[in-house]
Amino acid sequence: AIPRMLAEPAWQTFSFWIPLYLAKERGMDIAHIALFAWMPFLAADLGGLCGGYVSPFIARVFGVQLVRSRVIGVGLAAVLMIAPGCIGLVASPYWAIVFLCIGGFAHQTLSVLINTLSADCYPADEVGVANGFVSQAGWIGGLLFSLALGQFADTVGYGPLFGFLGVFDLIGAVILFTFIRHLIAAQEARDA
């Protein structure tokens, strides 16, 4: 639940703050926002599809168990989330859009993999509760970050806040690796 709590602020930031960010920080008018603001969501759709294929691909190519392949996929997506963390470092609004697209793709890939881990790690009669708890934690994280973003965007700007988004997913991946390590070891010992 903690990795999802740290990942969800990215999606809520993308969903609710991109147009305001593009207008205030990047000086885009409504016509330019309409031309570009949809792109991170298309990239997110592709990330959602990729999330379903990446772990079986990793398992097949590298010969690792499915749960380990999902965790590796989460790690790869978390590394890609560094891109939106660097938005404040680029001068061009078009590069900012590219970084938002990478972030949308990475977040949805990561989100699919974290949700799927609930089914991999819990008995069938507990999956719904586990996934509900993970989703609740995610939305709490998103709510808290949205409150902070609304409070601090005018004083510190969006750049540092986007930076936190990149760091949050890396921290979440490390926490996931730490807590799921024993489950992966037990699964691999059982299958050996």
Question: Model-flagged regions — what are they?
Answer:
Residues 67-114:
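C-terminal transmembrane helical hairpin of 12-TM major facilitator-type secondary transporters
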Residues 48, 119-156:
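A late C-terminal transmembrane helix in Major Facilitator Superfamily
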Residues 82-89, 166-192:
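Multi-pass alpha-helical transporter architecture, strongest
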Residues 32, 66-69, 126-133:
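Cytoplasmic loop-to-transmembrane helix junctions
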Residues 22-23, 54-55, 59, 149-157:
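Interfacial helix-cap and linker-helix signal at transmembrane-aqueous boundaries
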Residues 29, 69-72, 151-168:
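A membrane-interface helix-boundary motif in multi-pass transporters
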Residues 1-51, 107, 111-115:
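Extracytoplasmic gate region of multi-pass secondary transporters
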